[in-house]
Amino acid sequence: MTRVNRNFKDSLFRMVFHGKEELLSLYNAVNGSAYTNADDLKINTLEDVVYMGMKNDISFLFASYLNLYEAQSTSNPNMPLRGTIYFADLLKGWIESNQLDIYSERQIMLPTPKFIVFYNGLKEEPERKILRLSDAFEGQQDAEAALECTAVMLNINYGYNRELMEKCQMLHDYSWFVDAVRQGVRAGKTLENAVDEAIDKSLKEGVLRDLLRKNRAEVKRVVLAEYNEELHLKNVRECGYEEGRIRERIELIIKKIRKGQSLEQIANALETTTDQLKEIYEAVMKAAPDYDMEKIWEELKIK
């Protein structure tokens, strides 16, 4: 029975692909292979690597490849950088466990790193996208960099990458289930009700049946945690946007006041009403003559 490590919030992706058989099926689908020797797959996930409180990565050694699979609900161009750091730690552990000498005159042979990002966010993305560490380098793009890390991002939202889904039933079921939850939320159901209904529907349709029968409560807890994390990040972004908008308006009002303009004149210049500007205007006037931005901001937050 799949159990969730209580030291972190696991992701549904990790629960679905927790077993070696399921992980090998995903590997075969991604690589177009047909391996059946799941016991040869060695999982070596770094258990202390947690992103935003959520554990959403799986790494494993198989067929001379060092694989890093990560599920993402946001489009993140910094995945290659994270992959570089992750692979460095994995290779360090691999070298130590195999007692290899990096100072030897002999060439040390290493497993080939492969980084796959499984994307199921709401932002529109292509079915397949290549992300490179070198895209972040500030130097000339034609200059030869000493380091590179490439991540292949696959869009696994329901309806995308159909051929890949046909090759891996568990990936199809994962995508179908996530879509079922989202449909429930879009229909106006509470998140908890949407998850419950998606689970009931999945059991009826035979989607993720074994996992849901054995771990219904665990799956529900994990999905609620994931969606709450998404909502938190969305709220943080929205709050940041709103703060930036207000600070920009404060700066404009300060400039107008220094030019001797009244509240009415400023409102006319900004094409708004005095009522909409009054609170900020009064906070700015209170901070005269220094007009300290942070003091003005704190004054507005108190109000």
Residue ranges with predicted function:
Residues M1-K303:
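Elongated, amphipathic alpha-helical interaction scaffolds
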